[in-house]
Amino acid sequence: PLTIAEGDGYQVNYRKHYRKALLNVIPFNNFSGSYSASAGLIYQRDKEENQQTPMTMDTRTAFVVDDNTIFFYAGVTEEELENRELYKVTAHFEDDGILTLDAPHKDKIGFNFISGGYVISEEMDALQPYLKHRYIKLDMEYEYNELITDDLYIPYRFKGSLTMERKINTTIPDEDQAIIW
């Protein structure tokens, strides 16, 4: 664990002229990371599925909440969107493959969780025997509204899966160092 504490003991490296240390600490759990989202289809709910081309996203980043929970942004919501907090969806993982979704602002965006599950599979690399591939597949279906104004919105339904591959070097004992990011 890393602890950052203020103190007078820090000495500036005057040769390099650095006065601050910039750290990019990224917490992780077994489910956080970058997921392939191209198998997740986003439909407008007010049109028939066979009368429209579904929208997709290339990737979706899942961020840590706690050991068994992540959050991501609903549907086609951009991760740089100014009001992205409205579209935050939390995913909680149970031990038996059950995935439950919730949204902190579900009343505002009309979030409705329909179904969810997940599968974790592992296999060793054929060419590099020390390398383990862990695949996490999230299957889910939910509905939400994209707000245009206070009384105008577009109703969407997400249906499909997100998949993440994590490569783990089994010769390294520290979990955070063993993952090949």
Describe every region a protein language model picked out:
Residues 3-181:
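Intrinsically disordered, low-complexity regulatory regions in eukaryotic proteins
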